[in-house]
C-alpha cells in the first residue's frame, strides 16, 4: 500500500511538473498585441504640465472615427516633443488606451 501511494504521488508531481513547463514554454512564444499608433494633425491650444496634458484642436481622425474637435492628450515620459508652443500647427502620433489618448510624439508642421 505504501509503495502504491508513493507511485501515485510521484505520478501526480510528474504530471504537474510537465504541465507547468509546458505552460511556461508557450508563454515565451506568445506576443502581446501592439497598440495601434494613430497619426493626426491639429493646432496646440494649451498645456497643463502639472497634469501632463496638452490640449489640441485636431482635424478629423478617420482611424478612430473622430470628428474635428478639441481634446486633451496625455504626455508620457516617452513623448517626443520639443519647441512646441500654443498656436503651433502640429503633426502628432498617439495610442488610445481606454479613455486615455497617450501622445507618442509631436512636431511642428507646415
From Swiss-Prot:
Keywords: Copper, Metal-binding, Periplasm, Signal. Residues 1-21 form the signal peptide. Its main location: periplasm. One of its GO terms (cellular component) is periplasmic space. GO terms for molecular function: metal ion binding. It comes from the Bacteria. Induction: Transcriptionally regulated by CusR in response to copper and silver ions. It is found in: Periplasm. Part of a cation efflux system that mediates resistance to copper and silver. Binds one copper per polypeptide. The cus efflux system is composed of CusA, CusB, CusC and CusF. This is Cation efflux system protein CusF. It comes from Escherichia coli O157:H7. The gene is cusF.
Amino acid at each position: 500500500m505504501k509503495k502504491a501511494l508513493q507511485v501515485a504521488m510521484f505520478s501526480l508531481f510528474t504530471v504537474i511538473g510537465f504541465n507547468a513547463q509546458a505552460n511556461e514554454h508557450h508563454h515565451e512564444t506568445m506576443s502581446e498585441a501592439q497598440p495601434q499608433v494613430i497619426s493626426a494633425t491639429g493646432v496646440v491650444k494649451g498645456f497643463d504640465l502639472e497634469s501632463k496634458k496638452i490640449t489640441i484642436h485636431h482635424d478629423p481622425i478617420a482611424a478612430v472615427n473622430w470628428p474635428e474637435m478639441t481634446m486633451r492628450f496625455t504626455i508620457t515620459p516617452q513623448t517626443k516633443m520639443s519647441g512646441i508652443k500654443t498656436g503651433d500647427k502640429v503633426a502628432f502620433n498617439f495610442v488610445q488606451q481606454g479613455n486615455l489618448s497617450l501622445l507618442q510624439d509631436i512636431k511642428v508642421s507646415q
